[in-house]
Amino acid sequence: CGVSVVIHGADLDDLPGSACADHSPQGRVHTGQILEHLGLAAAANLAQAETLLQLQGLVYLPLSAWQPGLARIFALRESLGIRSSVHTLLKGLHPFAPQEAIVCAAVTHPPYLQRLQEFFLATEIPALCFRATEGEPFANPQRRPDLFLCHQGESRLLLAKDHASLAQLPELPDNLAASTSEFISAVLDGRRALPLAIAEQTAALLLLSGRCADLATARALLRQSFTRIAA
């Protein structure tokens, strides 16, 4: 849709294993693994990330490639078996100047959602904030959460969470990197429908980025870009 995307996350070699007991991510599919299956290599440093971003418009940036100190603290989860405040801190960071990028940030626990919004307002970083799905910043495909827009000194509810009963559950992939990457490929080439909740999240990000002037324009752009969007 014409907007470059940087996804930062854990180093693939340092993903938590069985030692983690506190909200363990063991068994989850991590974004870096999915992108690896899609043939998108992780950047080794910021210079390489910039090159890959120009070439393909999307890049995965491991934490050690731009915040090695925080990466070492993050890796302690494996030995200690608990999370630290680094997890929350990382949600607000990105490798750009404050006004050069927008942030898509999500938290698992409701009390942190307000704190996250306060952080983005204080730092004047434009951001979309919402409840996470398995710790990841994408809208739950089964039911869209509240989407809050932090921009120009205010935080507002852009789209309220979906309370409607589901007529049927969205067709989603198994909890495997290979099947998830195949699902993404199928959505991109029109063999499967883009889940509506994710389409609405994307529309909100297109609005926040300035790519589209309003939600109606963003939704129209998505309909041009994806041949199938779930109802």
What positions do the PLM features span?
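Glycine-rich anion-binding loops and their surrounding alpha/beta cores
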Residues: 16-17, 36-38, 48-231
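A generic, well-ordered mixed alpha/beta core segment in the N-terminal half of proteins
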Residues: 1-52, 59
